[in-house]
């Protein structure tokens, strides 16, 4: 089985990548498998900058092809916030409860038809001495007025999908892995996936 490295320490993201890549018979390794690398500070101002920073840093250290993603929630009524700061929106990295609480507070009084939003994902594929490639995916939704569902992570309990009548945290994981922003970005990557896997297996 081929193995590919995903430059993330986020367990929720890692689990999604594992399930999505499993259908291609590709095993996933993450930064949890390489503790010596440590945390990579996301200093970019765009999803692409942060994804490239993570992928290129890890590719350089391990001397092989690496995929990284940077993703987040874009809320129209908040001028695109939380955006690249989604994970640390409330000031503490990866505190889902605090982030959701702040999002609801900032949207108090906003009418349902004005609560449109989208999850965005940019994938960066970095290979030492080669130009980094980018793939993007999005999924459209509306921010609910209260938390619903226990599946998923992050803003999933607030991200309402009108076509399903459910939040992202209420739909089965299998369905989420078909329609999510991350899944849509990987669909864009699919056309080049054989080439990426070939680079990995050469190492």
Curated annotation (Swiss-Prot):
This protein's cofactor list reads:
Mg(2+)
Q: Where is the active site?
A: 70 (proton acceptor)
Pfam family for this entry, one: Ham1p_like
Q: How is the cofactor bound?
A: Binds 1 Mg(2+) ion per subunit.
Q: Which residues bind Mg(2+)?
A: 41, 70
Relate the protein's function as given in its record.
Pyrophosphatase that catalyzes the hydrolysis of nucleoside triphosphates to their monophosphate derivatives, with a high preference for the non-canonical purine nucleotides XTP (xanthosine triphosphate), dITP (deoxyinosine triphosphate) and ITP. Seems to function as a house-cleaning enzyme that removes non-canonical purine nucleotides from the nucleotide pool, thus preventing their incorporation into DNA/RNA and avoiding chromosomal lesions.
Protein name, as recorded: dITP/XTP pyrophosphatase
Q: Which organism is it from?
A: Listeria monocytogenes serotype 4b (strain F2365)
């Amino acid at each position: 089985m081929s193995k590919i490295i995903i430059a993330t320490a986020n367990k929720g993201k890692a689990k999604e990548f594992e399930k999505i890549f499993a259908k291609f018979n590709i095993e996933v390794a993450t930064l949890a498998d390489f503790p010596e690398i440590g945390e990579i500070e996301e200093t970019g101002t765009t999803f692409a900058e942060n994804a490239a920073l993570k992928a290129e840093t890890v590719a350089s250290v391990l001397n092989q092809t690496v995929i990284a993603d940077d993703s987040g929630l874009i809320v129209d009524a908040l001028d695109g916030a939380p955006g690249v700061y989604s994970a640390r929106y409330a000031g503490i990295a990866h505190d889902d409860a605090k982030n959701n609480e702040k999002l609801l507070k900032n949207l108090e009084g906003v009418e349902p038809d004005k609560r449109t939003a989208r999850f965005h994902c940019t994938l960066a594929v970095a290979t030492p001495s080669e130009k980094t490639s980018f793939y993007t995916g999005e999924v459209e939704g509306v921010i609910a007025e209260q938390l619903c569902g226990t599946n998923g992570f992050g803003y999933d309990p607030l991200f309402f999908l009108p076509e399903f009548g459910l939040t992202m945290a209420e739909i089965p994981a299998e369905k989420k892995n078909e329609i999510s922003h991350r899944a849509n970005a990987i669909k864009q990557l699919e056309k080049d996936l054989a080439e990426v896997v070939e680079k990995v297996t050469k190492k």
